[in-house]
Amino acid sequence: MFKNEYQGGAFVEIFSAQGKNPGAKWKILGSPSVIWKEFDKEVKSFVFVLEGSSQTNRIQLPKENKQILGLIQRFLVLQIYVPLGQDFSTELLITDLGNIKRRLYLSTVHKEVSSTPLHAKIPLFMIKRKIWCNLCIDLVAFTSEIFKGAVFQSLDGIIVSANCKLRKIFTLKFKPRETADRDDEPADIIPRSCQLATDVPHVTQLLNMTKLRQTEIKFGGHPLRSAESDQFISSRAGSVRSSKSQDVCHIAFGSRVLGPPPPSGRRNNLRLSAETVRSIGYKNNQSCQQPAEEKHVNSADTSALLIPLSEQQGEKGSSHPVKQTTPLPASLPTPYPHPPRDPSADKGSSRRGLGLRSSSGSRTEARCGSSSGNSRSEEDVAMAANNLTQLTTEPVRASTPEPPAAEPPDEWIFPESSGPPSGAAGSSSSLLLDGDSRTASHLWLETSKDSDPDQAEGTQMAPKDIFTFSSRPRSAPHGKSHDLSPTGCPCILDPKEDSRVTKGDTELEDDFYGSDSSEEEYNWRNYQPSQMSESELQMLASLRRQQNEDLEDTGAPHGLSASQVDNCNVSISTSSDDTTTWNSCLPPPVNQGRHYQKEMNPPSPSNPRDWLNMLSPPIVPPSQQPLEQSLDSSASLSVQGGALLLTQPHLASCAVGC
């Protein structure tokens, strides 16, 4: 209709109630009883009156849907009067540069901005009522901000619904000056032909996204939700957010579209549940955090605190009580771990304690109770041990004098935990802090004898239960030897026992490792185990048994020598593929006194009768059988490196038999 008309002026008039038949070009939807023209004495001119329901009573321009207006000016002005307590709405059909037609629904019924790719709902609750108003709508701003990427091209349709009084409709090329406008931006005035009389109270109100946001901030009770309004409101502290927040973008017609989606009950419920889940997860994360966690400890400040386990974790994160640790004064010597005094005798319980006692006798205890599947509590224990490692700035050297029996060297010993059904009790582990491997066995033997009675009882109850790490230590101190047996036995070579221990102790704590080490940086290549065959393991087992028997005969106070302890020091493979493979932790020393490969050499020549008597039963007359049986019962046979050697009692019996 206006496409071929000149629109380069200040305004273009679309509708006026003056004249003989002002609604001739308009499509009127409603009976004459609700839509009519009358003379208004207040404004001293004719006006169009629309009453009744805004859904049914309205006027539309152009009449035919195939026609278009083709209005290209930026601002659309409705000169209207809206009564109190009545709804009013208008609908605008716009076309963007992509020739896509979109609709803007402006109504007092809407309480928030919502949009789809082709439609948008804009609230009009801020409109001035019971006064004549020049309602100026910024078409360019609404198009570009609501429909992302769209650029306004033309206004092609207008629908005005009840309830209102309508005097004029026109477009403006420039922004009009508002009644309460204090901006310094350039603004135009309403054209003289479109102005109301000076004695008629009226206001000019500009409507765009910025005004909608400002109105929301002012009133607070009417939320506006769009991409810009969310950013605008979040930048101001005084704004009030509603729980029904809209998404910045949504899916429409199979593609992702920027802008808020239309409100719906199902979408709000889903969004509310998502926010609830996020808030619950945030509270749980806060409850599981440790408030006094310190990862960097100054070497000068030796009065650092152990990490206290948070009470919130005991209340929310775990069902077991948590006992916080106490700070260590700076005057105390370097603390070392010490076993708790009361190991639990309950096999089904998985409560574990970590005791800390320095050489002066002061004791600090940190307990944490958790189930075997509670990985978070295990991480807390590992973190406490990590900080304990950081506190020990200097390791104990070999030159340190041997402590008296009254105060044995401190070691990690864990009380009983849930074991296999065969009745295995809790496991214990000892970490000797002496650098000399030769004195390690002496220290362990003496301290095991002079330790507390409760500890001795716990050791006797479980002579075969061994504490094994489920993962290889990442920061193993150099020069330290591990005594895996409570009775001083340096190694375990029974594959069956290995599998039993591995299955039973998988619920124990993970390896305590830390980011810092008291010595030089750990090189894993130095501790890479070498593969050993089954025959070599059997040879080591026979060597250990032979050495134990020899030392029992000679009255030695301990097991093997230090070099043999290092050679027999084995660890269980932690690979998930093979849990029964034994690996040697350290290579065999060069200066070892006795080596199993040397023992495999053929023995020195001996009496062939001794070998015949041992490999096959001798032919003995029946009269001498009782004597031979009594003598054979007192003989002992030992195996060393696959070769069979005869002891002195058996040689004597063979001599008598011959």
UniProtKB/Swiss-Prot annotation:
The record's annotation in InterPro entries points to: CFA20/CFAP20DC, CFA20_dom
The cross-references to Pfam families, in alphabetical order and at most eight, read: CFA20_dom (PF05018)
Q: Where are the residues of the annotated region Disordered?
A: 312-522, 589-634
Question: Which spans does this entry mark as compositional bias, Basic and acidic residues?
Answer: 339-349, 494-506
Where composition is biased (Polar residues), the residues are 319-328, 625-634
Give start-end positions of Acidic residues composition bias: 507-521
Report the coiled-coil segments: none
Q: Low complexity bias located where?
A: 351-363, 417-434
Q: Which PANTHER family match?
A: ORF PROTEIN (PTHR12458)
> What is this protein's record name?
Protein CFAP20DC
Q: Which gene encodes it?
A: Cfap20dc
